[in-house]
């Protein structure tokens, strides 16, 4: 059986269960050729599970999948790649000691040239075509998170994918890196690529997508044209009820100073500086948020404060009942 080829992908009545848990229930999803479709939903709504079936990681219990007008059976990532589908996951699958270009050609079927200069040239041309900023000869362990993501995207493009799935691609990016990624995605769309972005960030959905498909608790709620919707409507479709996006926060009455971090510096497990002269104070009766993209030192900060991670400079002091006592001594009762 076949369906209209104007759709790059059609998923009909797809269901996936894990034991007694239903991750996706009778889901219908359509991706048009040459569009950017946002797949929107709360955490746990089944977005990634649905796309894992399209990329061959999971196999649906029920339902049909059509790619470029033909019904297909996708039992593995190899089947998915053969259909021109490539998925970029949240957690990168790169070999740190290899270069960008080496990672991109790693695992390719057939005869692959071992001429590094030729490989670097081809990867560089592909990166330039879509507007990526990447040195093909750079080792992965020297790359930023954004550069590693670029390598993952180029990997699927190099294999010939024209249907791309990006799982929470901006979760680890700065606002500037996010805007650069969106520019690249628009260039890919102009080149005829069909793109699905899994996300729950409403502002980014409205900025980059052509249409928005919404999942809620594993079920398909509907699809809307991005130009005809707003954050309020999308939120209601995600949650199932109207939600006020305006938060009225009362003024906090701070108590005594409880924690003082002074010029704290530490290295991560790879010997790279994770914290560099970090200073702040926390007061009783308040909730202090620590913000930053993944890998910015939040984990090392919390573990150092708790005495689980050594510092190479600075101090962490408990203030209050025993003013000026190091936190580690306070925890140990010294």
Model-inferred region functions:
Residues 2-334:
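Glycine-rich phosphate-binding loops of nucleotide-dependent enzymes
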């Amino acid at each position: 059986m076949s369906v209209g080829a104007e759709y790059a992908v059609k998923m009909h009545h797809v269901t996936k269960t894990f034991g007694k848990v239903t991750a996706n229930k009778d889901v219908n999803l359509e991706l048009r050729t040459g569009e950017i479709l946002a797949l929107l939903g709360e955490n746990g709504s089944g977005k990634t599970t649905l796309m894992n079936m399209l990329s061959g990681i999971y196999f649906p219990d029920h339902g049909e999948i059509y790619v470029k007008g033909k019904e297909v059976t996708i039992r593995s990532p190899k089947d998915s790649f053969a259909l021109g589908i490539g998925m970029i996951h949240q957690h990168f699958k790169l070999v740190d000691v290899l270069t960008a270009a080496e990672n991109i050609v790693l695992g390719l079927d057939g005869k692959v040239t071992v001429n590094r200069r030729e490989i670097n040239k081809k990867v560089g041309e592909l990166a330039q075509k879509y507007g990526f900023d990447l040195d093909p000869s750079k080792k992965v362990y020297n790359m930023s998170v954004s550069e590693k993501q670029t390598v993952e995207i180029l990997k699927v493009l190099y294999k010939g994918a024209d249907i791309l799935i990006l799982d929470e691609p901006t979760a680890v990016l700065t606002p500037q890196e996010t805007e650069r990624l969106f520019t690249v995605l628009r260039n890919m769309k102009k080149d005829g690529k069909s793109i699905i972005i899994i996300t729950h960030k409403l502002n980014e959905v409205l900025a980059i997508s052509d249409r928005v498909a919404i999942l809620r608790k594993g079920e398909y709620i509907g699809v809307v044209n991005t130009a005809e919707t707003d954050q309020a409507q999308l939120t209601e479709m995600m949650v199932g009820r109207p939600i006020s996006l305006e938060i009225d926060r009362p003024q906090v009455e701070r108590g005594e100073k409880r924690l003082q971090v002074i010029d704290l510096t530490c290295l991560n497990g790879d010997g790279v500086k994770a914290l560099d002269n970090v200073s702040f104070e926390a007061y009783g009766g308040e909730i202090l948020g620590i913000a930053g993209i993944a890998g910015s030192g939040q984990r090392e900060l919390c573990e150092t404060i708790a005495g689980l991670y050594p510092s190479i400079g600075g101090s962490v002091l408990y203030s209050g009942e025993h003013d000026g006592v190091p936190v580690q001594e306070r925890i140990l009762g010294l």
